[in-house]
Amino acid sequence: MITLKQALSLSQDELETLKNEIDAKVRASDLNAYIKAPSLNGASAKGVPILIKDNISVKGWEVTCSSKILEGYVAPYHASVIENLHQNSMAGFGLSNMDEFAMGSTTESSCYGITKNPRDKNRVPGGSSGGSAAAVAGGLAVAALGSDTGGSIRQPASYCGCVGLKPTYGRVSRYGLIAYCSSFDQIGPITQNVEDASILFDAISGHDNKDSTSANLKPTQTFKNLNRDKRFKIAILRDHIKDASNEVQLAYENTLKALKEMGHEIVEKKMLDSHYQISIYYIISMAEASSNLARFDGVRYGRRAQNIKDLKELYLKSRSEGFGDEVKRRIMLGNFVLSSGYYDAYYLKAQQMRLIIKEQYNKIFEEVDLIFTPVAPTSAHLFNYHASPLEMYLSDIYTIGANLSGLPALSLPVAKDPLGLPIGMQFIAKAFDEQSLLDVSYALEQELDLKLD
């Protein structure tokens, strides 16, 4: 597939040809990365075609978060990131499959069916932005937008062999993103390489008056300032990699060796055990989800239950029929931790621990420029691999820290396991220092020159 950098130099006629080629590929593909062929969404704006995750509003398109409960909901306005794309010669072209309401790590909970990993169709693409990552890796998209609540851009990028960037919280507007956990959610790019990630990130970043959490900063210029010659002081968290598979640990050590040979300084640091972070993350995210998803009741928009007797039954049936099992589980657990008698014991304590985690990251970043970790404990696993929801939640063990602390993080493919499946590693930077993330990743990408095909 042509890169985003290359596509931006095409004429309008050439872009129309490219869109037709992508549409034909999607129709012929069995990956199920797109919800439907892009042409079925209606006419798209002029510009380089960018795949959009199915929780980002595109005016006139049916946007469902891959859930039955939003069946038939047509977005009445553009998300701010879509308007930003239009201002930078890009446009939405198709919606990608995802875990329902972004609650999952495998893209198996979508009402549209599973998405397959293009590297091995018997394996998951990761999630929740699995459709976006599978499309980019499978040659079905120039680039894509995803959302990241606890690793939902970075983990599928690692599983599929793409570059995935979660910007600093507040760097990219969330206006028009259908919320899962408002204090963690962030929109970001999934691309074929670091240059493309930089270009797409620059296009969607910047202050937005329509988002009260948007940082009052100008759009970034990371692509213009990309520098592969900078050297950084990089922290590693040895205690945190003990849960990784042997293949991931080997890739981690080999990448560390490459970073040292490139002239970067590596230092060891310690912080709160990552298993505590998992508990904190899920308590807060489920609590916010139970509140955010209360609006989907069958009254104002989306799916409405039929043959009901009264308002109570309308609510009950619409939500029971419309939400999948994982979403119901998180809503119930979220309501539990917010309930009387448990609020202080769970939710309040989790928020207090979140502040401690932020302080620990800030303390580390007083001495270093970046933190280096794996993205996931394993490479992509087979479908129906997890024996329980708790096992699935543990797959986020390396990514949630950046969401808890609002920091930027980037997933870069660095190796292949014995089966040829990609393995990604993650850099985390100080707040609003995406430039360092992209610089070190750009240099490492050039150094490793990993061939996945």
Swiss-Prot record:
Record protein name field: Glutamyl-tRNA(Gln) amidotransferase subunit A
Signal peptide region: none
A GO MF label: glutaminyl-tRNA synthase (glutamine-hydrolyzing) activity
EC category: ligase
The reaction(s) this protein catalyses: L-glutamyl-tRNA(Gln) + L-glutamine + ATP + H2O = L-glutaminyl-tRNA(Gln) + L-glutamate + ADP + phosphate + H(+)
Cross-referenced Pfam families: Amidase
InterPro entries: Amidase, Amidase_CS, Amidase_dom, AS_sf, GatA
GO biological process, one term: translation
Function: Allows the formation of correctly charged Gln-tRNA(Gln) through the transamidation of misacylated Glu-tRNA(Gln) in organisms which lack glutaminyl-tRNA synthetase. The reaction takes place in the presence of glutamine and ATP through an activated gamma-phospho-Glu-tRNA(Gln).
Active site residues per record: 53 (charge relay system), 128 (charge relay system), 152 (acyl-ester intermediate)
Species this chain originates from: Helicobacter pylori (strain HPAG1)
Cellular component, GO annotation: glutamyl-tRNA(Gln) amidotransferase complex
Family: Belongs to the amidase family. GatA subfamily.
Subunit structure: Heterotrimer of A, B and C subunits.
EC number: 6.3.5.7
